[in-house]
């Protein structure tokens, strides 16, 4: 089915006081994400993927080792990734982490802070463009992972609970080359933990 650019669930300037400027959201959502939607729709038109869901397109077109040559996958996966990214952020100080999520993270990582440290390290350590993730694996275990370019947990049968874009366009306007600072700010000020917990 045709991709549709989702509206942001908040105003473009709603995150500005928390470290993500109106300019960043205008470029990132209105231009970058829109380009993935527009290009994806052009590429799937008249193909077997035209009437498939974005999730089916991502899993059906993923080819390990050949992502750079796969335009349909790249645009579909980046559309899916960004739709999640907008959903798990919110205005106001990052909402209090629900007890169930706090408990799950503490049991898995030792503490919520250790999870945040591991997540930030994964994002900072991703060479080049990519994403940092908190995922629920097929066996129900929580893990921190990172992926290159537009690859996402759907490719591996995993459930994405939290994703952070570490492509340079996501942070250069506000943080320049300071990716670690961007990741820390994301975790401490931008994440809507209630939205993350709802994906458990």
Where are these regions (language model features)?
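Feature for soluble, non-membrane regions of globular proteins
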Residues: 1-200
